[in-house]
Amino acid sequence: MPRRGSVARREVLPDPIYNSKVVTKLANQIMLDGKKSTAEAILYGALDVIKEKTNKNPMEVLEAALKNVMPLLEVKARRVGGANYQVPVEVRPERRQTLGLRWLVKYSRERSGKTMIDKLAGEIMDAANNTGGAVKKKEDTHKMAEANKAFAHYRW
């Protein structure tokens, strides 16, 4: 533990178009090599594609997708008496959102498709419909936590 005080977390500013902090955080996850304007162009393009295909508000689709992707439980390795146990722990709200956004971007990149705009739009729409790689990752994470329920008393 550091002796000095902890560093204050930087506040994320809402994006100019949708006035949403979630959109800014998603753009930051998409960003590679500090190219934020490129990341924002990809994200806004994907949200436009979602609007065209679903005829719904893209923010509602994104919120639904994020809700279906955010994990409630995860496992953490805990060493007890020479053995490593996978201990299920609850995920804090901030980390839930971060993991959800990270998984959406990760599985968007792994999709087959022409452009990142189409891949991201497809993954968000799939997640909103409870399908896709990011939702599968959440379910796998929950299964791991469920399988290791016996070690829950090792929580710290």
UniProtKB/Swiss-Prot annotation:
SUPFAM superfamilies: Ribosomal protein S7. GO terms for molecular function: rRNA binding; structural constituent of ribosome; tRNA binding. It comes from the Bacteria. Keywords: Ribonucleoprotein, Ribosomal protein, RNA-binding, rRNA-binding, tRNA-binding. InterPro entries: Ribosomal_uS7, Ribosomal_uS7_bac/org-type, Ribosomal_uS7_CS, Ribosomal_uS7_dom, Ribosomal_uS7_dom_sf. GO terms for biological process: translation. GO terms for cellular component: small ribosomal subunit. Coiled coil: none annotated. It holds the Pfam family Ribosomal_S7. Part of the 30S ribosomal subunit. Contacts proteins S9 and S11. NCBIfam families: rpsG_bact (TIGR01029). Belongs to the universal ribosomal protein uS7 family. One of the primary rRNA binding proteins, it binds directly to 16S rRNA where it nucleates assembly of the head domain of the 30S subunit. Is located at the subunit interface close to the decoding center, probably blocks exit of the E-site tRNA. HAMAP family: Ribosomal_uS7_B (MF_00480_B). This is Small ribosomal subunit protein uS7.
